[in-house]
Amino acid sequence: MAIMKINANMLQKAFLAGANRIESKKEYINQLNVFPVPDGDTGTNMTLTIMSAAKEVAALEQPTMATLSKAISSGSLRGARGNSGVILSQLFRGFCREIANKEELTTDDLAACFEQAVATAYKAVMKPKEGTILTVASGMAEKAREIHRKVKDIEEFGRIVIDYGNEVLAYTPELLPVLK
């Protein structure tokens, strides 16, 4: 059955599932960490950041988009660790700006959320470099913008955007001169 809209309860569950997924992939993400410093802590920092937000999100008994927005934004900012955590918190901040005044989200809304997330994160980084988490987020936002009018099922939309993010991730080493 196609899901054409998601409400705050559904988004809360999706966010918590995503947080748990990042936590379960922490070591894999640590291995991806090669720039700016190959210190192997990107997964750890992203996990600490998102789990801080997840704690606040999980505490919401009757979530609305506004309360989710606040919990995700403030929780991720308070829990942000390292460059990757700060960037992740800014991606969430931009995304949450778009959802705060909504009742439900469609693929059109999600595409706008991804665009705002990327714009906010790029502005937060003094010298953004391609071949990083920013590149992956930007690619995902571009794919969302490309397909949102054709793909209305949120699950299919999410799969396509995530699959494209993985393609961009695989290509990122080609974009960093220090890795060539």
Where are these regions (language model features)?
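N-terminal loops that bind phosphate or other acidic moieties
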Residues: M1-K180
